Regions:
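Macromolecular interaction modules
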Residues: 1-120
């Protein structure tokens, strides 16, 4: 796995899931993978966690607000990749599509904290 990550949470416009996923997989991910510093991508569908109703929990988890996640692996600092990403969006060479609900997008950059640990 690469050193740094972008995590992007998103939703399609209402009723546009199929078109959104087709665009994301066939157009958007390849465009993002063309950005220097982006070395890999993996998309995820929301898998809602069902909490047993008989548990006495101190608080309930709020419902999720996003249905899709993509994790981009980066081989350089997130700021450098973001600068090129935005440059390409403004130039029109990295598209945001017609089915993406831009108002729901959450993009964050992440750098490791400590060493990676694995279960024994």
């Amino acid at each position: 796995m690469a050193e740094n990550l972008f995590l992007v949470l998103s939703n399609p416009l209402e009723g546009q899931d199929d078109a959104f996923n087709a665009w994301y997989d066939s157009t958007h991910v390849p465009e993002v993978l063309d950005v220097p510093g982006v070395v890999a991508a993996q998309r995820y569908d929301l898998s809602e966690i069902k909490v047993p109703e008989d548990e006495d929990l101190p608080a309930q988890l709020p419902p999720p607000t996003h249905r899709y996640l993509v994790i981009y692996e980066l081989d350089r600092e997130p700021d450098a990749v973001m600068a090129e990403f935005l440059k390409r969006v403004m130039a029109g060479t990295l598209t945001l599509g017609e089915t993406l609900d831009v108002s729901t997008v959450s993009l964050t950059g992440w750098t490791p904290r400590g060493k990676r640990r694995v279960a024994p």
